[in-house]
Each structure stands twice: as structure tokens, then as C-alpha cells.
Amino acid sequence: ISCSLVGSEMCIRDRFGCGVDCASETELMMAYALDYKPGEIMFSSNDTPAEEYAYANEIGATINLDDITHIDFLDKILDGKFPETMSCRYNPGGYFQLGTSIMDNPGDAKYGMTHDQIIEAFKILKSKGVKHFGIHSFLASNTVSNEYYPTLAKILFELAVELRDKTGADIKFINLSGGVGVAYKPEQTPNDIAVIGEGVHKVYDEVLTPAGMGDVAIYTELGRFMLAPYGCLVTKAIHEKHIYKEYIGVDACAANLMRPAIYGAYHHITVAGKEDAPCDHKYDVTGSLCENSDKFAIDRMLPKIDMGDYLIIHDTGAHGFSMGYQYNGKLRSAELLLKENGDVQMIRRAAVSY
């Protein structure tokens, strides 16, 4: 749910048979309100408050433990009555590589259990009555490579066999989580989900099937991949500033889309009605927050922008509105849904008060 908190989008995803991964009590409440069933809700949180664990258990969400110490914490919350199915999050440490390219550094990540910890966690949970187990891991974000999932799958499939052999645990599912990204830059080659699926299938047949584990379900968290390309932030040019650089000030800001400000993330920008015009002007595109990082683009080549032009900031369907905030007292914008028949529906009103 973290990639998009819009209830109507969640209903659309439900129509295609998707479950939901939740990271907070609020997200759990949304999933429950939208009638997601217990087997369709995963609760993957960290540094989790007691009341959130209690609520997750109450609605039948599958709890994905981030740390081995949470077992005792959960034991007290649930009065020793553990659910029959639970999952544990794995962190292999070190660097995660695809070929010779370092994709991320799990050893610096706050998430998950070490190799020895997850083995011990399965043993403890089994002794407390847990009957069915899942494994979860997230090792890299927004990869634009068809090799990420198959590489991660091999790590987790081999771990699953080891856990089964060393603990006797019944492994019901392996969650490859997120990480399959989108091509934010026009020159990038998009991921091919069919190729990715075949790669995972190949590793499954090489590792799990020969081990007698050919019935293990595979879960994924493809929120960004499914939603990012299908949303955009539309903003109006309202100021032009000429100092040491050329600035275009717009009526949106990082409170509407914070990825460029906090990650330095690239989002493609087009100017409505000037899609075919030459990109021969260099601009920084800025919002009005009292932060110099409030920039949607830096030194971006764009067509000449006139006041009143609408700028289309692309690929904001995931981690756009849902990451918004209210710094400087900024209010949330409206959200519109473009339907298949061309109709436009307002799915969230603009905020009118703080």
C-alpha cells in the first residue's frame, strides 16, 4: 500500500487478484476497510509498536517479523497464542551484486535477520506452535534489470531448502518483495516482466522442485512497477527567475512529490502543447518550499516555458501523493482518475485546511 494510499486504486488492484503489503496500522485499516481477506494481507513492518502487531493479528494479516527479538515482544502481546502462519524477513548482509555491478548494500540496511538469526527464529516460532512459514527479503530498490528477481530468488530458494532441512519448517511461500523498478529516464530500457517471470521459474525448477518443494507459493510486491508509469503530477508555471541560473517556479512543490528532493530522483517532464518543440532551454524547475532541495529538475533541457504553461511530471503513480507531507503548511492537491472510457473522476478532493 505504501506506494499509493488511494482506495480506488487498491480496488482496481483487487480486481486483478492482487493482495496488499502493509507497513503500518493505518495501511492495515485501509486494507481491512476495503474487504481484503486475511490471506491477502501481509504485514511487513519494522520497529513495530505493540498495538500494530495486535491489530494485524486481529484481522488475520500474515505477520512478517523483521527481527528475532520481536518474537518475545509478540509473545507478550498475543499472550503466547501465535498464528499458524508467520513469515520472517532475511538480510544476507554484504553487498548485493548482479554480475559485476553492485546494486545495493544490505549490510547497511536496518531490515531483516541474519542467516543464523532466521534459522533460530524458525526453530523458536515452530516451538511456539507456528505451523506454516514464509520467507521475505528486499535487497535493492527500483532495479531496471531483468536479473534482479531471478538472482534474489536463487538466494531465497536455497535458504528455504536449508531452513526446511535444519528446522523441519513447512515453507508455504517465498516473498520476493519489491525492487522491480520502472524506466524513469526515457533512455532506459524497461523491465520485461515476462522475462523476469521465466527467470524466476527457471531457478524454481533448479532449486525447489528437486528438493521436493514444488508447491511453495511465490509472492511479489510490484506496486511501483504496476502504478508508477500510470500517474503524473500536473503543475502550472507561475514564475520565471533569472539569476545565476534560469528557474521556472511552479505551483506544486516537494510536498506533492518528494522523490526528487530526498533521493535526487529523476522524473521526466514534458510541457503540455510543446511535446514536439525543441528542448533548447536549460532550467531548474522549482517549488515554493523554504528548502533549496525543492526542485523537480536541475539543469533540465526543456522547451521554452511561458507563464501559464502546464508541466507534466511523469511516472508519479507510485510514491508520489502517498509520500506527500505538510511542511510549510502546504495542503494536499486533488487526485483525478482517468478511466478507460475517457471519463475523469475525482478520487480525492484537494485539502482545504491544515
Language-model regions, residue ranges each:
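Active-site loop/helix belt of alpha/beta enzymes
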Residues: 92-239, 302
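Short active-site loop/helix that positions an aromatic residue
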Residues: 28-34, 72-77
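Single conserved hydrophobic/aromatic residue that forms the stacking wall/gate
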Residues: 1-7, 11-12
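Conserved, mostly hydrophobic/aromatic
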Residues: 24, 56, 88, 135, ...
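Glycine-enriched alpha-helix->loop->beta-strand junction motifs that scaffold or abut catalytic
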Residues: 15-19, 35-40, 54-63, 79-85, ...
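Hydrophobic, small-residue-rich alpha-helical packing segments that form membrane-like cores
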Residues: 58, 64-66, 70-107
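Catalytic beta/alpha-barrel core
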Residues: 17-26, 40-48, 61-69
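Charged (often Lys/Glu-rich) extended helix/loop segments that serve as interaction or gating elements
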Residues: 208, 213-354
